[in-house]
């Protein structure tokens, strides 16, 4: 597993994340995830509220790519990994409680990504280069 730095954790908390998955037919799906959060040093997670195409793709075994960027800072990160879908365990129940506290829709699932690779998206010579890889 690749490990998040404290800077990366703060960056994720303060910027919008975009995710990408791919269907069995090879169709790419891209969308924002405002509920993205750091679960621990090696995992990202979010509230899957719509149970739409991303959810289906993950159920079908798609890997997950998460990109987080800040235009003003010209800085960003890309995270790649495999996902476990949580629907009836302690992780899920804790996030249902969080959703209730925030007044947001109860998640259909909580996808948790084990981070296998971290790439730098900061503008410049290192853009797209791997920072850490499992």
Briefly describe each language-model feature range.
Residues 1-134:
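Binding-site signature for planar aromatic cofactors or substrates
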């Amino acid at each position: 597993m690749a490990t998040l730095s404290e800077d990366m954790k703060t960056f994720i908390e303060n910027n919008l994340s975009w995710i990408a998955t791919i269907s069995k037919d090879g169709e790419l799906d891209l969308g924002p995830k405002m509920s993205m959060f750091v679960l621990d040093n090696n995992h990202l997670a979010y509230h899957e509220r719509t149970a739409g195409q991303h959810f289906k793709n993950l159920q079908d075994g798609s890997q997950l790519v998460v990109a987080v960027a800040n235009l003003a800072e010209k800085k960003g990160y890309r995270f790649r990994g495999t996902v476990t879908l949580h629907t009836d365990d302690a992780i899920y129940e804790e996030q249902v409680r969080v959703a209730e506290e925030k007044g947001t829709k109860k998640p259909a699932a909580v996808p948790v990504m084990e981070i296998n690779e971290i790439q730098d998206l900061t503008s410049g010579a290192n853009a797209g280069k791997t920072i850490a890889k499992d």
